[in-house]
Amino acid sequence: MDSSPDLSLKLRRGSSDSRDNFYMDFAQGIDSDIEEVDNTANNQEAGEVPPPPLPTVSLAEEVLLLVAPPPPPPSLLGQPLPTLTETDDIPPTPTPPPQQKDDEGDDEDEREEPVPEQDQGAPAAPSPPGSPINSVLELELIPPPPLSPMDDAGLRTDDDGEGEETDDAEEVAAIPPPHEMLDIESNPDEEEEEEEQEQASQEDTPKEEDEEEDDDKSTPPPPLPPLPSNFSYVQGHNLGQVTPPLTKSPSNSPSPPVTPPPCPELNISRMVSPPAQHISQIPPLTPSDESEGEAESQPNSPPLRLDAEQPPPDMDQPEPEDQPPEPENEPEPEPEPEPEPEPVSGAREDYSRSLDNEDESTTITTPPSNGYSASSIIAPPPEHFAELDEDRGFIPPPPLEQEPEEEVEEEEEEEEEELTKETDEISVDRESLQDQGGDSISSPRPASILTGSISTSVGGGAGGSPKPESRGPSRSGSQRSQLRSGSQQGSIAESRGGSRIGSRTGSVASAQAAGVLSPQASLKSQTSIRSQGQAGVRSPAGSIKSGSQRMQSPQAGEGAPAMPSPPLMRSPPPELARQMHSPPRITTPPRVCSPPLVSSPPKLAESAAAAVGVAATVKEQIGSSSSTAEPLEPSKPEPLKPPIATVSYQDEQKPSPPPTAAAAPAVTTTAATTAVTSQPRSHFTSSHHHYHLPHQFQHPHHQNHHTHSVRVPTPTVPSSYAPPPPPDSGSSSSPVDRRRLFMAGVAPPIAAGAGSLMAMPAEPAVAISPGRVSARSGSQHHVTIDESSLPSHKGNIQETPGPSGLIIGGGDGDGDRDIGGGGGPDSSDPPSSPGGSSSQPALSGSQADGQLALMYHSHQLTNYPVLPAIKRTHRPSFVYPPMPRVKAGDALATLFSALYGKLLVVMGIAFPMAEVISTYIPPSFYEVYYLYLYIGSMIFLLFMYATLIWGRPKLPVPIASPSKSATKASGTDSMDESDTDSNSVHHRLPPPIPVRRPSLLSPLGRRDAHYGSFYLRMGAVAFGIGSMIYSGLEFGQYFELNPDTKCHNVLLALTPATRMAFIFIQMYFIFLNNEQIKVYRYKIIARFGLMHMIGTNLAVWLNVLIQETKHEILTFYNPENRTLRISHRIPGHSRGHAIIQHDPTAHLRVPRGLKGPYQIFECRRTNIIGTLVQDASPFLFPCTIEYSLICAAILYVMWRSISRPQTPTPQRPDMISSPMKRSPHHYSVDCARAHKGLFVGILILVLTIISLIIFFVLISRPEFVAMAVTEVTICELLIYGTATIATLVGMIQIRHLQYDAYRSFSLDDILLVGAQTGSFLYNIFTVIAGHFTLRSDDMLVPINALASIVQTACQTMFILDASRRQAVSPEHLRKKPGREIVTFMLVVNLAMWAISTLEKSRAESHPIQLNFYGLWAWTIITHVSMPLAIFYRFHSTVCLCEIWKRAYKLKPTYMXEFARSRIQSIAQQQQFCEDLKTNLSYCYCSTTLAGGELETVEEVDSGESNSAEDAGAGAGSGGSRGSGGGAGAAEAGEAGEEGQQGGDSSCGLKAPIRALSPQSLNTEKAFCPVYVINGE
């Protein structure tokens, strides 16, 4: 390992070739393990010519390929196994080798003088196959292309990645074990440590990753080779530890070995897929057998891998041969990368080991640099695509071949061992591993970056940096890999799920890119395949641990098998993706991101090397399938990556100071990839971010990881946004990947950062910052990520902007592609990140099979985004897939529950009506029906409370390990919620939400104020009290009934008592637990229970209405003479009219039908309590009706939210961030600019009360009835006129506030419009009666009714408009336009409510209408309409209170909505976010920008919690900036739903923590992650 440290130092300093060799060696070790598992496949593929990875390969094709891996390309077969000196071979093979060498030389010069030595050493060192470093150097033999060639290298990386992939896969199969094994063997203790760490990390991915980070830090990284004079170990703390960490690095290798086994199968495909450039790589087919065995042992994953691998071949057409031609990016750059990658490989390996030692912090940093650097560097001019194709064709993976099979086998054995361990650990901590998988994934993403799928390819294979972190350490430290195994498995999971999805996504993205860059497309598809292969192979064999874990995970239902589906979708989209993201393919250079592998901290480097090896193996397999997926082969990725890594290291270590270029280098140093410099960084960021995100993604909606990552690159993202088109065309895919990688580089390192964070700290804070941020933001448990590196990360971002300007721009495009292309293979991860970043990483990787549902949703999103990827505006498409995916069973249950509720309501109408209409029906015959309603509702409520209590203990579990719990708990516990949430907001599946939602009833994202506003629920309580009094009086009335009469029935006492209990329990349910009653587990029970309660409330309403109408009529009915006793009221009003004759036949219509044995008047209220009930009922029964209306409406909204995949569920950030941030029951009042309206309203209220008192005094005396009616009518007319004028003035004033057109029709709006119907009914009947009344002195009655109609219509419009208005500027906050009117209307509606309740509710108060319609008709009209009219006045008050309180606050939520509505393009949004950041203390805007469009305003409210995740993740990812910086974009894209909601929410997050400046991105990252963590 000494040579390894030397190599890492030299390579890190400036030797791309050495680093490449080193990484290649590591990758070989990993790949060898993988190939041990997958070598059979590799042999098969070697035998077969793997078709070049075809982005267009369908999942089915992929499966076919997996089943029957195509023979390795003739080139692969023809290529002799590369010898350790393959570096020499590589330079000759590539046409550009001189350039590569020159570039290498430059890079070496930049990085360090020792680099050349390492390059030389690489060729020389490689000769000893046993030496891991030599093996790595061999792998690195392909000299990493110089920075400028790196673009070519990037392209060539595709070729190299593919060709090397194939060879590397083979070599890795044979050689990687030595290098990895050497690491492992060299540091068995470390290996054990790694295993322990992996286990621990698997158990506590968040902790583990952080701990791993610490452990890695504590465990000195493997001694770095002496850095060149100009390079210093930026990873100081970790580098310092580098020498000791070697143990760790090896311990990582054990973990990686487990992870690699799955990769090997992919390698097989990939090996076959990429041209067999170096059969030497193929020789380790023996590992392939193991790998195959492992794959077989993990049939699900291997087939998927094969699918992934073979489909890419189909995509790329001829697997190996076609790939070389197909990789457009590969042709020219690849040759250069081959030479340069040698140094990089060597340096990378050394550095990788150092990084491995530093695994987490270094890894985190390195991948970002690589991703970015690769992207920048790799993005070659379109003309280079042909070169890439050529390069790809001739790039052999030298070191991999040369790596001894012994090492491969040993590594594989170790991997298998660890795989077993990790498998258990992984299965246990798969989610954590998957979270870690983000690292691994980030590594594959760097590979993807190298590939055409810059992020994906690099992320997938070369991305190995993060992956090496997970992968190389995976090989060298399989245990650590377990730590990373989460990463690796996450990487595998992500590779496999993410890679598969990503790879398929990548494939799609690759295919898209391929459209422009055939090679890149190939690479990407290879990456895709490789990712898939990695996902598949690693899962099964490559990373036995990861594979086993994945297998377990798939067995758990989250395995790769599930992931393949998304890849399938991805696969077909790839062609589109190609065309759409063909330019991103150009970005293929990011594949050069192989440096990310190198850039991985020493541990990361090892991990990266192992990861690269695994990735290479997987990529080779995939590469064989997807020739373009250069990253697949560690050597190929490494060659490309190494250059990037070299540059990164040089820059990072040397330039670490420079914020832009140096910062990126710093990040590179940190990330080892940053060496690639700012150029690759963009890509690298994408790839790394992508990978890292998946790893941390998995955890809590690793959007946060994405978020961090994005956040880190956020500054760049803006530039990305500006240049999104170029990236779209040339680097859209890779930019997204880059952005992802950037994020990944930042975030993935963090993801690895959980595991890789340790390594990352070793690297300059620059890289750590991104990673740290990433860990913090994405992996809520990773909050510990070095913030010191935040500046560096910012530097990265800044540096990235230049190169990543396009790249990030591409990343931006890729953000869509992230969403759309999914950032190449990694895209699946980011898409997963967007869809359910936390669950998707797990899903894509470990949970590919089982969690496919969640993952698949995200991947579908990813697939969808593939097409939309081109346009950032297509984020919505990203949002749409998350849209509720309703299962057939759920739809059926919803339908039946709705029919059941309708049946209850119809019966509630029929029973009381039949009793009143017919005299042959005994009284209270239907009371049993109401007992059934009340008791059934109470049982359901008690069940809900019980589940709420039972569920509470579970909340901490998901919270404890958000990644595991988020994905697994989400998959199981929150499966329903994830089903809903994932469906509604797949990506939204916020880890925080899963954390808090595990309970059966978890908080329904507090939409507005829960379900309905606080005032509405207060009104429900007040009306409930009145209703309980009413029921209590009815209950007492029973004891006065004569036992001998037919009216005496025990049910008459039992029903009111039961109703009283029901009202009380339901009141508690509605008022207090409304926010907590969110059903996730027992959806069918919840649907029928809620619908039963809705039916109960409506039946109560109808029953009370009919009973009260009956009793009021009977009050005036005289059974003796069968007349109505209301004549005493009429005479005063009649003025000579013969009002109602006492002629017995005059009103026989009243008792008509009462010829049966049962007369309704027999049981009327006659006794003391009966009289009291009758007198109080006009005031009490409206309370029952209004209470039932409110409860029915609230319950209906809850039922609908269950039926539809809880789109409202997106917990608001405030709910997520902190359990409740502020108690939901804490309210504050600001009376500014409300005094005039308040006191004028009080004056009107006083006049109204006086008028009512006069009315009741006069109406009691027959001679003054007319005067009483006239007095009240005049008072009403005055109030209506004043209120109408005030409403019109208010509508003019409130127009100054910002209108939110996205706000959906809310519960308050529904109740308001519904209640207004009652007012209209009453007034229309009154106008008709007044018009046909001949008396002129009564004309005030119809005029008053018309005035009431006009006033209610204006008021309804005013309320509906004002409820969508929001103050958005300081002027609004200062002037508060319209607030005086709102205050006045609030008080006036209270006055009108009093009039309606006290005066209008009594039929005898309106002699004209009573005389015109008759007693029966008018009483019925009054009892039906007046409760609604009363409720309209009350609810208008409620709505005005809500407007008064909310419209004049500058809420980030609404501002985000405003931003969304105002900002069309992401770039504009980005700028808007910048402005907001500058002007406001929150960065919610960043999430908004990232999301692009809120799904709905409703979701915004509800989405605020999402926003917490989003802001935590989206804002955390700098979501708004640069579309969330790739991952952020994807996440933001997903967050777009959620993030936009969250965007609003982001504000809701109170992202104030986020700094206002682009640099605040770091702060932002830190901030959002912190929130997420808190929410977690």
Swiss-Prot record:
Residue stretches of biased makeup (Basic residues): 686-709
Per the record, where are the segments of Acidic residues compositional bias? 103-116, 159-171, 186-198, 206-216, 316-341, 402-419
Looking at the Swiss-Prot or TrEMBL record, what is one Pfam family this protein matches? Otopetrin
Cell location: Cell membrane
Q: How does it sit in the membrane?
A: Multi-pass membrane protein
Where do Polar residues bias regions lie? 229-241, 362-376, 434-457, 519-534, 545-555, 776-799, 962-973
InterPro entries named among the record's database cross-references: Otopetrin (IPR004878)
Q: Which residues are glycosylated?
A: 230, 267, 1121, 1479
Q: What is its main location?
A: membrane
Annotated Gene Ontology cellular components are: membrane; plasma membrane
Which stretch is the leader sequence? none
Could you list this entry's UniProt keywords, alphabetically sorted.
Answer: Cell membrane, Glycoprotein, Hydrogen ion transport, Ion channel, Ion transport, Membrane, Transmembrane, Transmembrane helix, Transport
Ranges of Basic and acidic residues composition bias in the record: 347-356, 384-393, 420-433
Q: What are the transmembrane regions?
A: 741-761, 891-911, 931-951, 1019-1039, 1051-1071, 1084-1104, 1179-1199, 1239-1259, 1272-1292, 1310-1330, 1340-1360, 1381-1401, 1412-1432
Q: What this chain does, per the record?
A: Proton-selective channel that specifically transports protons into cells. Proton-selective channel activity is probably required in cell types that use changes in intracellular pH for cell signaling or to regulate biochemical or developmental processes.
Q: What protein name applies here? A: Proton channel OtopLc
